[in-house]
UniProtKB/Swiss-Prot annotation:
It comes from Synechococcus sp. (strain RCC307). HAMAP family: DHNA_CoA_hydrolase (MF_02101). Disulfide bonds: none annotated. Belongs to the 4-hydroxybenzoyl-CoA thioesterase family. DHNA-CoA hydrolase subfamily. It comes from the Bacteria. Pathway: Cofactor biosynthesis; phylloquinone biosynthesis; Quinol/quinone metabolism; 1,4-dihydroxy-2-naphthoate biosynthesis; 1,4-dihydroxy-2-naphthoate from chorismate: step 7/7. This is 1,4-dihydroxy-2-naphthoyl-CoA hydrolase. Gene3D superfamilies: Hotdog Thioesterase. Its EC number is 3.1.2.28. One of its GO terms (molecular function) is 1,4-dihydroxy-2-naphthoyl-CoA thioesterase activity. The keyword Hydrolase applies.
Amino acid sequence: MRFGETDAAGVLHFQQLLRWCHEAYEESLERFGLEPATLFPTPGQQLNLLLPITHCSADFLAPLICGDPLAIALTPQWLDPTAFEVAYSFSSAGRPVARGLTRHQCIAAADRRRAPLPEGVQRWLQASVQT
């Protein structure tokens, strides 16, 4: 953990946890072989399907200070044909320090209605269940 990620009390600033959750999610998708540009909008590109986060939560179990090592494990779970959530476990030196959760809803860009998850995300979720 770096100094810029702490608050005035010298412990983890709360918003950093959710940033790390999203970074771990993006990295997991990339390691699975899904290109970010196929899932996340970029300038000048219109996607047919969008995956907004509809819920997030964070629980802080122990303080994290500058210099603490940090490991993140994530567990995706399929909720229904149009939604999934990802649970995140944070540990430092083998002890649990935080947990997070993001819930994602697939919608069609054209009308903002629920839509089936993209095939790549479905494969990622299926592979996550099997491991």
